[in-house]
């Protein structure tokens, strides 16, 4: 059996040994992105690598808003979010199916019965042998979780979900709260704007002036964040046909966009504490 975690920041698959599996060619995570160009649909990593170059042809809401209603976006005329989720899972299962059978699916704690029924139908249509669905928060518990009430925080593309777990006996979900609109996509946009502002202030070069440099900055963002975990500042270089522009970037401009999210999370924690932590 394998585990499949449906988080739109990057769908993951793990084997019985709990090691992550290659879910796309050369990738351990498949982000919930779709791009349609000239009638051709791309999903996952390939779509994300085009998302800033062709934003009007990009959809990254289909897992967050999983439904069968027709999309109003002209670029996706005749499509539904369920269709895009089907295409994404089809690509993932093509990678996993040759060597794996039986799948336990970890789903967002915000999914209600309509989303779960729709997801089950998609997986049945793809002949994915689903053994069952489980809460993201429960799936994330370590084998020896503390025997107390715990709070699990899950960052998605367009929301942050807080789930209360009672682990004093067999672990169960007591409830959850969603900080809507505060997810990784909003943070990425704020971080990119902060970096672009630094470039404009110091070099007069605007990475947002050209779609290719905007995409390059987006693609480089995970590396920059990893570097700033280890050091107080790092160099950011943006190449154009005429020149290469460089700045030294500190943590501070990237920490400021986190404050509204942290405030919203703390407010939800206060509410959950009143309801579940006595």
Q: How should these model regions be labeled?
A:
Residues 10, 17-106, 228-232, 236, ...:
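Conserved phosphate-binding loops in N-terminal lobes of ATP-dependent enzymes
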Residues 1-30, 37, 143-174, 191, ...:
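Gly/Thr-rich phosphate-binding beta-strand-loop-beta motif of the actin/hexokinase/Hsp70
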Residues 84-99, 141-144, 255-278:
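Phosphate/ATP-binding catalytic cores across multiple sugar-kinase/actin-like superfamilies
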Residues 114-198, 251, 261-263, 267, ...:
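Small-residue (GG/TT-enriched) beta-loop-alpha framework at ligand/catalytic clefts
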Residues 72-83, 245-263:
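Glycine-rich phosphate-binding "P-loop"
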Residues 166-251:
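Phosphate-binding glycine-rich/basic clefts of nucleotide- and phosphate-handling proteins
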Residues 98-109, 208, 212, 271-278:
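Short glycine-rich phosphate-binding loop at a beta-alpha junction
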Residues 65-72, 91-95, 125-126, 194-202, ...:
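Conserved, well-folded catalytic cores of nucleic-acid-processing
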């Amino acid at each position: 059996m394998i585990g499949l975690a449906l988080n739109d920041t990057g769908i993951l698959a793990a084997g019985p040994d709990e090691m992550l599996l290659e879910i796309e060619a050369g990738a351990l995570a498949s982000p919930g992105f779709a791009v349609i160009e000239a009638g051709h649909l791309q999903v996952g990593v390939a779509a994300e690598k085009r998302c800033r170059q062709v934003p009007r042809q990009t959809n990254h809401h289909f897992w967050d808003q999983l439904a069968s209603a027709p999309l109003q976006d002209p670029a996706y005329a005749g499509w539904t979010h369920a269709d895009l989720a089907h295409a994404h899972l089809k690509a993932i299962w093509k990678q996993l199916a040759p060597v794996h059978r039986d799948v336990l699916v970890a789903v967002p704690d915000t999914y209600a019965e309509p989303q779960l029924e729709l997801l089950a139908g998609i997986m049945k249509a793809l002949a994915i042998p689903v053994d069952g669905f489980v809460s993201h928060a429960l799936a994330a518990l370590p084998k020896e979780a503390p025997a107390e009430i715990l709070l699990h925080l899950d960052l998605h593309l367009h929301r942050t979900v807080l789930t209360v777990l009672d682990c004093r006996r067999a672990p169960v979900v007591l409830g959850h709260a969603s900080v809507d609109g505060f997810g990784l996509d909003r943070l990425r946009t704020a971080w990119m704007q902060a970096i672009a502002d630094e470039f404009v202030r110091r070099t007069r070069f605007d990475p947002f002036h050209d779609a290719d440099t905007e995409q390059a900055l987006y693609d480089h963002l995970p590396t920059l964040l990893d570097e700033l975990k280890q050091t107080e500042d790092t160099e950011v270089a943006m190449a154009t046909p005429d020149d290469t522009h460089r700045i030294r970037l500190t943590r501070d401009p990237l920490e400021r966009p986190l404050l509204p999210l942290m405030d919203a999370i703390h407010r939800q924690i206060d509410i959950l504490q009143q309801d579940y932590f006595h």
